[in-house]
From Swiss-Prot:
One of its GO terms (cellular component) is plasma membrane. The keyword Amino-acid biosynthesis does not apply. Belongs to the UPF0161 family. Pfam families: YidD (PF01809). This is Putative membrane protein insertion efficiency factor. The keyword Cell membrane applies. Residues 82-119 are annotated as: Disordered. Its main location: membrane. It comes from the Bacteria. The lineage of its organism: Bacteria, Bacillati, Actinomycetota, Actinomycetes, Kitasatosporales. It is found in: Cell membrane. It is a peripheral membrane protein.
């Protein structure tokens, strides 16, 4: 359902919008806002955001910059993700010592003073 709506907005932008000229009081324009919101949030929520934007775009509105809100993940998604990460367990690569039995001599970086300025 998302792609037919996006096609209708593009059709409007290519045919009707050039005839009307720049009449939108907001940046980005209402049609660009609608395209982005439907593309980002899907057909239902994107259409609702677009309808609310078109209702706000009127001669009594001051206008201004109004970007599409970012997509938010629901709270249950974050809890589930954290629970799954906790179940994996095990040690990370940072916790495991390197497997070399031969110790390497300290390099030149270990010999320099911490206040030295390098090139």
């Amino acid at each position: 359902m998302k792609y037919p709506l996006l096609a209708l907005i593009k059709l409007y932008q290519w045919t009707i919008s050039p005839l009307l000229g720049p009449v939108c009081r907001y940046y980005p324009s209402c049609s660009h806002y609608g395209y982005t919101s439907i593309d980002r949030h899907g057909a239902i929520k994107g259409t609702a955001l677009t309808a609310w934007r078109i209702l706000r775009c009127n001669p009594w509105s001051p206008g201004g910059v109004d970007h599409v809100p970012p997509r938010k993940r629901p709270r249950w998604h974050e809890l589930l993700r954290n629970a799954l990460r906790g179940e994996k367990g095990g040690e990370s690569a940072a916790d495991v010592p390197s497997g070399g039995s031969v110790s390497e001599p300290p390099g030149p970086a270990a010999e320099t003073s911490p206040n030295a300025q390098g090139a």
